[in-house]
Amino acid sequence: MKKTLAALIVGAFAASAANAAVVYNNEGTKVELGGRVSIIAEQSTSNRKDQKHQHGSLRNQGSRFNIKVTHNLGDGYYALGYYETRFINKDIDGNEKNIGSGFGSITTKLAYAGLGNKELGEATFGLQKTIADKISTAEDKEYGVIEKNSYIPTEGNAIAYTYKGIEGLTLGASYVFGGRNFSDYEITDGKVSNAVQVGAKYDANNIVAGFAYGRTNYKAQQAKTQQVNGALATLGYHFDDLGLLISLDSGYAKTKNKADKHEKRYFVSPGFQYELMEDTNLYGNLKYERINSVDQGEKVREHAVLFGIDHKLHKQVLTYIEGAYARTRTNDKGKTEKTEKEKSVGVGLRVYF
């Protein structure tokens, strides 16, 4: 029997969560371990500042380990804790760098705790994903062309509330704190000072719909503030008989910058996911994004396209081929138009545990 696309998405694209192993379950306490080892072989070419760069690599692609602990408190209440690691490469000054094999030092990606109730929702505290992370439907494994963080932060050190009391519906709200340096306890220029966001996502009855709004304050130079008011939206429909999902993702943001130019930006991104055969899926999306400088007349336009195909060799083994191409044109008042191009193709393997 042919699988529905919704089942494929849960089974193939979220395998790490679905296949988490329960290592302890006694007297209301459950401990689950999960994660994946993920490798990609890629070839990339970029043309920036009139220089062409080309390189191939074999590197880590988001390998991780996570542990989740849940305690049943009775009367429908529970407490939870979650911890997830990543690998990170750093230079001699401790700055993160996307270089080498990608298997550097182990670092904390997510770490939070909380209290919840099946009917009332869940409150969590710590380093975690926000509701904005859910507001897109387009699929990708590595070269995602949609950069949601430019509109609303998708993770951070936050207080969050999530409600899932209605089947298929997720409601979320969060307040994100700024990260301070250990040396002087100040927020680094360009980093989030604080942010607030609300959103909702519905995925049931063949319909996908979501919306999020956020207001984010960034630390700018000379102790000034940069404020971004952003919105993200997604809409999709499952054609189960065809094994097809079509979607449209979009975003809009307005930046008020007391230290520099103001900006407006938006993007639209139609996409699809199609079941070629059992355990084999084709996916892709296009993106058009535009950024306008309100004060100085600078305009940036980006066209991007992504296609990929994945195949499950086993319920815990996924292979894929993915490629992306992006072209960015920058028009600055009184200057010659600049064009930058970037293309990448990769072959990946994920082994979940």
Curated annotation (Swiss-Prot):
Its main location: membrane. The keyword Transcription does not apply. Pfam families: Porin_4 (PF13609). GO terms for cellular component: cell outer membrane; pore complex. It is found in: Cell outer membrane. One of its GO terms (biological process) is monoatomic ion transport. It is a multi-pass membrane protein. It comes from the Bacteria. GO terms for molecular function: porin activity. Disulfide bonds: none annotated. Residues 1-20 form the signal peptide. Belongs to the Gram-negative porin family. Homotrimer. Forms pores that allow passive diffusion of small molecules across the outer membrane. PANTHER family: OUTER MEMBRANE PORIN F-RELATED (PTHR34501:SF2), PROTEIN YDDL-RELATED (PTHR34501). This is Outer membrane protein P2. The gene is ompP2.
